[in-house]
């Protein structure tokens, strides 16, 4: 995901 966001694990 984006830098430090909660979606990191989902979006890649």
UniProtKB/Swiss-Prot annotation:
Keyword entries, A-Z: Secreted
Tissue-by-tissue expression: Expressed by the venom gland.
Record flagged with keyword Secreted: yes
Secreted in keyword set: yes
Localization of this protein: Secreted
GO cellular component, one term: extracellular region
Listed name of the protein: Venom peptide 6
Source species of the chain: Brotheas amazonicus
């Amino acid at each position: 995901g984006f830098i430090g966001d909660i979606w990191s694990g989902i979006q890649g």
